[in-house]
Amino acid sequence: MLIKLDSLKNNYLFLLIFIIFCIRIIGLYFSPLEVQGDEAQYWYWSTYFDWGYYSKPPLVAWIIGFFTSIFGNSIFILKLPSLLAHFLTSFVLFNLSKAFKRNTEESLWLSITYLLFFAVSLSSNIISTDPFLLLFWSSSLLFFKICLNKKSIKNIILTSIFVALGFYAKYAMIYFFLSSIVLILFTDDKKELIKNILIIFFIVLILISPHLYWVYSTNWVTFIHTGDNFNWNASLYNFEQLINFIVSQFFISTPIILFIFIKQFAKTKKFIQSYSFEIAYSLPILVLITAQSFISRANANWSSVAFIGVTMIAVNVLYKNYKKIFLLNTTLGLAVLILVSTFIINPPNISPFNKLQGMKDATKEIQFLDESLNSDYIVFDDRMNIAKFLYYLPSKNEKLKYLSYGDHPGNHFEMLMPITIDDIINKKIIIIHRYDLPSNFLKENLLVKQMYEMPNSKNNFYISYFE
């Protein structure tokens, strides 16, 4: 009787996962929201194969390219891989929980809790690098845990493959090795663990060598860009940034999940003994990124991989001791899921939703202007704007250029499609610029200037023409 009852309960949990999937698919399919700048940039990268791109490793572009080559370039298809990646991650987390000898019901709850992360409800509607990083991070932890349970060269190789795929998604995969070093401190058989980590490291190095060669051949442009993101040349030691980052972390998963994780530190010795693996692959990352937020700044998602370990601990504690709070956490996650899906289908006129509308009309305006003026080039000074026009105005792609001043390229488009002031002298030019006029030369030669008003004032841009 107990077995049948447990089986019935698990079936309901599977049904809940299916319902979450259906809500997400319906919301994404019927959403009127358009492509934002980063998404358009990733799409443009996907139009040609390379081992790397200006600001990111290549995996997100490869995945977009695979989907769009089969199913077309619709916004739904462009964003769909993120949604699917999150559901694959939930499946991996189910198996990771089972690798810790936790029962089927708890493992299903781990999957559901991940799917109901506040950040996942948003991220499922945006094509970005994070869903794929989380998928391969979780897969790496799964096979590494299996390897620790039962030593096998097959599991070492599988771990290495998933770590390498994680690197191809995002450089934050480096935290795997940082956390593995911390795990050594908690392990009795240190020699064996160090040997396995070194084997994984060298296999990963071989697997990502094509990308490393690409980085070298482009004068380390991606590494330089990644280093610039740390912003250590700006004003240092910011309490405001620190507080903003800490607050943001309570909304990656849910406030309850992070609170339960933090609460366990009151039982330090027992906590470490029970959860050494999960702690090693979460706490060092949170500490490191929190320190970075104080030194300069840190985006909320920089610590996203830490929340796999955080959530594994919190779910185990909630499942064993706090069933009512667990139910409250699930209800909260479902409420946010429904709210986000409602806003995705019927977006309110507030940020960020109104920033993702208006490009189709803007494209028609620019196309009409270009054909009326018979311009030589359509020039941009903002990567977000040029990326969106590359997506929405493919017939004019050869005319689209990025205004360069000859310094180190500041983005992918300045690197691949630059145009200088000298190049546009005596040419008919449409300038689409984000702020005021981008140079004195343009001020002196300007014939027409008007602001194109998008639904959100922050999304406005200026259209200028000169010859």
Which sequence ranges carry the predicted segments?
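Short acidic/glycine- and proline-prone juxtamembrane loop motifs at membrane-interface regions
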Residues: 119-133
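Transmembrane-helix motifs of polytopic, lipid-linked glycan transferases
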Residues: 80-101, 116, 139-143
